[in-house]
Amino acid sequence: MNKYLAELFGTFWLVLGGCGSAVLAAAFPDVGIGLLGVSLAFGLTVLTMAFAIGHISGCHLNPAVTIGLWAGGRFEAKEIVPYILAQVIGGVIAGGVLYTIASGQMGFDATSSGFASNGYGEHSPGGYSLTSALVTEIVMAMMFLLVILGATDQRAPQGFAPIAIGLCLTLIHLISIPVTNTSVNPARSTGVALYVGDWATAQLWLFWVAPILGALLGAVAYKLISGSNKD
């Protein structure tokens, strides 16, 4: 039970910290943190939680990561469903807390503001198509898993995995916020989309399918590039 609670709290922190920075601080007049700040916020949530709960649950915080680690031979199949349930619950609770805070500002409307939801077409920050969004999310998730598997490999320098993984997520956001508002994490997308409804839930399928597919590809890619070094 401890590891499931760790995943719940960890994903809560990721959604509250990352999406919270986007909703509350990104465009704050004069001192808003902007795209760079939001990207760093997401990376910092993973970095801090990796040190806090990595020894308890492995600090997945992401259904795609959980499935990718299973595909990479690092995780048991029987744990996939409870991990994903804990992650989604944590994300949804964080979305509710953030919605409560944001609603305290006069004129706030989750649907019209987007509430840090992920989208494509007219709901992409840069107006990118479904195809662009699909390719972006698959490739970003693939690279994320490759970095995770590499950084946590027993042959890698020890103690630096949280830094590498946190910086990787920051870089992913710097690249892809203009395209999809960056998901690579179905729990993160679900956690805010449920409070927007409408278009956000209609487009949510892509932010489950693409990250999971990308994570599976990342697991395959890491096996290909690391296999010859095992002996």
Curated annotation (Swiss-Prot):
Site features described as Involved in tetramerization or stability of the tetramer, chain residue numbers: 19
Motif NPA 1, residue numbers: 62-64
The protein's name in its UniProt record: Aquaporin Z
Superkingdom to which the source organism belongs: Bacteria
Topology term for the membrane: Multi-pass membrane protein
Similarity comment text for this entry: Belongs to the MIP/aquaporin (TC 1.A.8) family.
Organism of origin: Vibrio vulnificus (strain YJ016)
Gene Ontology terms, MF aspect: water channel activity
Disulfide bonds: none
Location of the protein in the cell: Cell inner membrane
Gene3D superfamilies per the UniProt record, alphabetical: Glycerol uptake facilitator protein
Its biological purpose: Channel that permits osmotically driven movement of water in both directions. It is involved in the osmoregulation and in the maintenance of cell turgor during volume expansion in rapidly growing cells. It mediates rapid entry or exit of water in response to abrupt changes in osmolarity.
SUPFAM superfamilies from the UniProt entry: Aquaporin-like (SSF81338)
Gene Ontology, cellular component aspect: plasma membrane
Coiled coil: none
Catalytic activity: H2O(in) = H2O(out)
Upper lineage: Bacteria, Pseudomonadati, Pseudomonadota, Gammaproteobacteria, Vibrionales
Domain remarks: Aquaporins contain two tandem repeats each containing three membrane-spanning domains and a pore-forming loop with the signature motif Asn-Pro-Ala (NPA).
Sequence motif: NPA 2, positions: 185-187
Pfam family membership, one: MIP
Positions bearing the site annotation: Selectivity filter: 42, 173, 182, 188
Listed transmembrane segments: 8-28, 33-53, 80-100, 130-150, 159-179, 205-225
Record's keyword terms, sorted: Cell inner membrane, Cell membrane, Membrane, Repeat, Transmembrane, Transmembrane helix, Transport
Oligomer and partners: Homotetramer.
